[in-house]
Amino acid sequence: SMFPFSSDWHISYRDHFSYAKEINRLKEAYKDKIEILLGYECDYVAGVSCPTKEQYPEEVRPDYLIGAVHYVPWEKGYLGVDTFFDKAREQINGVFKGDVKKAVQEYFACEREMLRDGDFQILAHCDLVKIQNSKKAPYPLFDENEGWYRDSIRETADAIAKSGVCVEINTGAIARGKLGVPYPSLEMLEMLHAKNVPITLSSDAHSTEHIDYAFDQAVELAKKAGYTEFMYISGGRSLMQKF
């Protein structure tokens, strides 16, 4: 999405209109063969950007919106959650005075704020911060088995259930060789299942060859957590499909 700012990984304001125009052209051209939807992944940055459909002009308004947290602002700086390990470590040292626990807790706090204030249908990679425990990292940034971390995902699972959004099982980090498992973790997915939170499948593809990457692994994880169906959007409605 063009919000909150223009960068290599945010579409520019100018290009947003041509992108939406092309998607809407393809919708019409292929309407007898496939249903095409216009959707964006929009960043939540406290005080800067919140994923809501109303912020988009009518000609680029999406059929659905995915809410995501990639940036954790704190005092005079921010943590880029999905950045390289060394950069994240540097930002935590500078912005959070080296307090990894505080940085991770603030990430989940930002996610809960977005769930409270946003207007979107799907929550993106809801434990993205574990990317810093990547198999490409020199060492894990934190221990996902510690009580404070499990408390954070439990509190966030409660907020997700209260908000009514759908959670994606996201295989993007597998495709890009950073993790061996999808987002979210099995433990968090089990919490979500217990609260009747619907799920959907997402490859978070950055290239066409990854469009359905590791979906078999995502389905296996979903079933292990107790899920038997997933959500998809069609005709402006959220529908359920058995695996």
Regions flagged by a language model, labelled:
Residues 35-39, 63-66, 121-123, 164-168, ...:
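Structural preference for beta-strand elements that scaffold enzyme active sites
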Residues 34-45, 78-91, 118, 168-175, ...:
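Short secondary-structure transition/capping segments
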Residues 26, 106, 110, 221:
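Residues that form generic nucleotide/phosphate-binding pockets
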Residues 129-131, 136-243:
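Charged catalytic cores and adjacent phosphate/nucleic-acid-binding surfaces used
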Residues 16-23, 107, 149, 153, ...:
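Aromatic/hydrophobic pocket-lining residues that form the small-molecule binding cavity
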Residues 1-87, 97, 101-105, 210:
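A metal-dependent hydrolase metal-coordination microenvironment
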Residues 22-32, 54-63, 115-119, 155-164, ...:
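Acidic (Asp/Glu)-rich catalytic clusters
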Residues 2-3, 64-160, 166-169, 173-176:
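Divalent metal-binding pocket/active-site signature
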